[in-house]
Amino acid sequence: MADVPGYLRTCLDMGKIAFLAILVSTGIVLQILACALFNNWWPMLSVIMYVLLPMPLLFFGGSDSTSLFNESDNSWINAAKFLTGASAVGSVAIPSILKHAGLIGWGALALDLSSYVVFLVAILGYICIGDASDNYYSYI
């Protein structure tokens, strides 16, 4: 992209951020629909896990975002990876347990899990944008 004019490059970069914002808002809408369509607010429990998911990396990972993907001897980084993985499993386990207990139906389970998948795609998209060669998004 070195030969692309600056104004076009900025427009494309803002398009990527807008796409990520649309993904996140779609995930929020799916989460609310999982609750509102079936008049059952139990699926909102998985929102707690969505909020807790990035916390270990924020507290223990520091400013190095690549520490999640690299092998490390630092015990704090390893603890952050473990707690993040446990939160990710909990994000899928909570709706599954609620369905098994009979508190939510199949539709709410499908919407809740699809919300999780949309959030996951948004996070992976953010990581891919953050790994760009120009490090333009390092301030976000």
Swiss-Prot record:
GO terms for biological process: protein transport. GO terms for cellular component: endosome membrane; plant-type vacuole. The chain crosses the membrane at residues 17-37, 41-61, 76-98, 109-129. Keywords: Endosome, Membrane, Protein transport, Transmembrane, Transmembrane helix, Transport. The keyword Nucleus does not apply. Residues 1-16, 62-75, 130-140 are cytoplasmic. InterPro entries: Vps55/LEPROT. Residues 38-40, 99-108 are lumenal. It is a multi-pass membrane protein. It holds the Pfam family Vps55. Belongs to the OB-RGRP/VPS55 family. Involved in endosomal protein transport. This is Vacuolar protein sorting-associated protein 55 homolog. It comes from Arabidopsis thaliana (Mouse-ear cress).
